[in-house]
Amino acid sequence: MATYAVGDLQGCLEPLKCLLQQVAFDPALDRLWLVGDLVNRGPQSLETLRFLYGMRESLVCVLGNHDLHLLAAAKNIERLKKSDTLREILEAPDCAELMEWLRQQKLMHYDEQREVAMVHAGIPPQWSLRKALKYAEEVETALRDDNLLPPFLDGMYGNEPAKWDSDLKGVTRLRVITNYFTRMRFCTAEGKLDLKSKEGLDTAPPGYKPWFQHKERKTRGLRIIFGHWAALEGNVHEPGICALDTGCVWGGSLTLMNVDSGERLSCKCDEHGAALPTVAPLITESSPVSAPR
C-alpha cells in the first residue's frame, strides 16, 4: 500500500491518469491525497470531478479556492468569470451529487502517524497545529451545514480583514480562516496577508515573507504538503515543506509525490493542460522524507 499526494489538477485529468498509471496506482490498496483546486481553468473539470468521485474511497482531499468558487457558483451566489471552465459542471445532471461530495471535503488534513499536514495554500506562522485544525473545522462545519453554507459562501470573498484576530465573529472570521488556508502566499510574522503578490520567493513586498519562511513559525518541525503557488515550480528550499503545484494548467507539469519516501514524478503538460508523452522522476530540495526534529 502506497500513499501519494498530487498537485493542483485544475481540470487536467489526462496528466493525473498518466501519473497514476506510471505508479500502478491501485484504488483498492493505495491512497491519493489531493491538495485542492481540483477544477477550473483546465479542459476537463467535469470529467476530473467524476473520475475522483468514482474513486472517492481512496482519496483524501482538501479544498482550494477554485473548489470553493465552484460551490458558490453552484448555489448561484457567485457568477462565473470569463476565465472559468465550470459551466459544464453546473449544467451536468449529476452536479448536485458532485457538489454534495465536494462540500464534505476538508480544509486541512493531518496524518498523526506520519506527522504530516496537507493544506491548499498554507498555515499562517502564528497558528500552532492544534489551532490550525480547530479553525479549519469551523469552516468545514459551515460547508456541511445547509443553513450555514449560503451565508458562508456569500461572505467568503474579499481580502479584509488581512490579519487574524481571535475575537472575530461570524462570516468575517470564516473569511480570514479561508483566506489563510486557500489563498495565502506572503504574510508578515504576525500573519498579516498580502494577497496581491503571486510570483516567486524573491517578490515578497517589504515586511512580508512566504508563510513558511518565518523563523518563529509555530508549525516548524511539522511536515506540510501544499499546492496553490505555481510560480514556485515545486521549489521552496525549506526542510519539511513540500510544494506540489507545478503549473500543469499553465503549460508546466503535474507532480505526484510518494508521501512516505518524498520521491516525485512529473508529467509535462501543454498550454491547455493536456499530458505530453513524458513522465520523468523529479528531484527537488523541497521533498525531504521527513521534517527536521
Swiss-Prot record:
It catalyses: P(1),P(4)-bis(5'-adenosyl) tetraphosphate + H2O = 2 ADP + 2 H(+). InterPro entries: ApaH, Calcineurin-like_PHP_ApaH, Metallo-depent_PP-like. Pfam families: Metallophos (PF00149). The keyword Hydrolase applies. SUPFAM superfamilies: Metallo-dependent phosphatases. Keywords: Hydrolase. Its EC number is 3.6.1.41. It is an enzyme of class 3 (hydrolase). It comes from the Bacteria. GO terms for molecular function: bis(5'-nucleosyl)-tetraphosphatase (symmetrical) activity. CDD domains: MPP_ApaH. HAMAP family: ApaH. Hydrolyzes diadenosine 5',5'''-P1,P4-tetraphosphate to yield ADP. Belongs to the Ap4A hydrolase family. This is Bis(5'-nucleosyl)-tetraphosphatase, symmetrical. The lineage of its organism: Bacteria, Pseudomonadati, Pseudomonadota, Gammaproteobacteria, Pseudomonadales. The gene is apaH.
